[in-house]
Regions:
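Conserved mixed alpha/beta catalytic, RNA-binding, or beta-rich assembly cores of soluble enzyme
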Residues: 1-54, 137-140
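Short low-complexity stretches enriched in small and charged residues
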Residues: 2-6, 70-72, 89-90, 107
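C-terminal edge-of-domain segments
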Residues: 6-8, 105-140
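Predominant activation on well-ordered alpha-helical scaffold segments within soluble catalytic domains
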Residues: 28, 32, 61, 100-104
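Short C-terminal domain-edge/linker segments immediately following a structured domain
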Residues: 43-47, 78-80, 103-105
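Long, charge-dense
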Residues: 51, 56, 60-100
Length: 140
């Protein structure tokens, strides 16, 4: 029996929107869930992308460090210029851009369309709090 070999170029950018203080485990679970649901390999992740206010977000920073992923962050002024399929007025009201996950993924990947539109992940465990929004774009 021959072993199967799969090669994955690191060309997927994962846009992440999350509440302040979300744990590394919660963010990791959200990414794993979305990748599993869409039959994508996490080995193809180039990095995570978010709004610049998350540049020191412990959960994001820890996950990127452990996985050896890049973390790109962008100011709201840039993210709000990105055309996204699912803008949110609620998000716009709070952080001055209608999108974080979708806009950050698109901007990081330097592309115009998403591989996976925003997916909102909430933990199944009642004691674990937080919400993570994930979107995925593929760089060329």
């Amino acid at each position: 029996m021959l072993a199967e070999l799969s090669l994955h170029p690191k060309n997927l950018w994962v846009g992440v929107g999350c509440q302040k203080g979300n744990s590394r485990d919660l963010i990791e679970a959200a990414i794993a869930h979305v990748f599993r649901e869409h039959q994508l390999s996490q080995n193809a992740i180039a990095g995570l992308a978010s709004i610049d206010t998350k540049v020191d977000e412990v959960g994001l920073v820890e996950l990127c460090r452990e996985q050896n992923w890049l973390l790109k962050t962008f100011p709201a002024e840039i993210l709000r210029t990105v055309c996204v399929p699912n803008p949110s007025q609620l998000i716009h009201k709070h952080i001055a851009t209608p999108s974080v996950a979708e806009a950050a993924a698109l901007y990081a990947a330097e592309c115009k369309s998403l591989l996976v539109t925003k997916q909102i992940f909430r933990p199944a465990i009642k004691d674990q709090k937080g919400t993570v929004t994930i979107a995925i774009a593929q760089a060329s």
